[in-house]
Design a protein with these regions (language model features):
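Conserved, carboxylate-rich catalytic/transport cores that coordinate ions
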Residues: 1-280
Length: 280
């Protein structure tokens, strides 16, 4: 056997983070805060153009947009984060629908999925680019903006009628009416839950900024032999600290997105343990 004893979960987690970081750095061509011009051509070629740092200044024009209107690489990364939100939250409601498949309550979960799809487009329009994802957008004769709003409306009605179903549609509607404020705020919460995933982009942006700052501080000292040792120490300390902060941020934000956004859409609550100080 390669390992005589099982690997500690912490090491497996750190290893997974490390491999994921290397993969993401390869796809986006971000290596220790270095500019693409400082990297070899073969490393640049491994990246995906639409999210690559190599094409940071490129304007990506879509088939339905006029000349001069398009998406930047940063906006493409934001779309990636919001798409990840759509996928994960949709999975939560699919699990809920399967759990309630023998009840009409399943229609409430389907309605929530429709709301997610519609609000996803609203987020792209309001947060990413209103010109590319306009409410008046028509693609192949399909009014995308109108369809998005219709999905939100249909999904809201389905959730309003069936979300509290326990054997009676009338009682389910009355329950929704009693909690009408919470029901209406639920639509806003869906919007905020999707937007919340932009924290993933922000964390990556902060890490890249720290790396670039460390490089700028150390680069003037690399040309002087007397200060080279200090430059090496600064680079090791700065990038090492950045890695530690990134590990913590990934754990913190990952836990939040799973225990709050994902769990709330899964209709799962965390009970925890009662805090009893001074008790052994």
């Amino acid at each position: 056997m390669l390992f005589r004893s099982p690997i500690a979960p912490a090491f497996l987690l750190v290893g997974l983070f490390g491999l994921s970081t290397i993969l993401w750095g390869t796809l986006t061509c971000t290596w220790f805060g270095l500019s693409p011009q400082q990297l070899p051509q073969w490393l640049q070629a491994l990246s995906i153009p639409v999210i690559s740092n190599v094409y940071a200044d490129t304007l990506w024009v879509l088939p339905w947009t006029p000349a001069g209107v398009g998406l930047t690489t940063a906006q493409n990364l934001q779309i990636f984060c919001f798409t990840l939100a759509l996928i994960q939250l949709t999975v939560a409601h699919i699990k809920g629908a399967l759990r309630n498949r023998k009840s009409l309550k399943m229609l409430g979960d389907i309605g929530s999925i429709l709301q997610l799809l519609g609000i996803y487009y609203i987020v792209l329009s309001l947060v990413v680019n209103a010109q590319v994802f306009s409410f008046g957008l028509v693609i192949s004769g399909i009014p995308v903006g109108t369809v998005a709003i219709a999905l939100i409306g249909i999904g809201f009605v389905m959730s309003f009628v069936f979300a509290n179903y326990e054997g009676s549609v009338i009682k389910s509607i009355l329950s929704s009416l009693v909690n009408i404020v919470s029901v209406l705020l639920g639509v806003v919460n869906v919007f905020s839950d999707i937007v919340s995933y932009i924290r993933l982009w922000a964390v990556g942006l902060a890490g890249a900024a720290i790396s670039a700052t460390v490089n700028e501080l150390a680069s003037p000292m690399l040309g002087n032999f007397m200060f080279m040792i200090f430059a090496i120490v600064l680079l090791v300390f700065g990038h090492g600290l950045n890695m530690i902060l990134n590990v913590l941020s990934v754990i913190v934000h990952g836990i939040r997105l799973n225990t709050l956004e994902f769990s709330s859409h899964l209709d799962m609550s965390w009970s925890g343990h009662k805090f009893e100080p001074f008790k052994e």
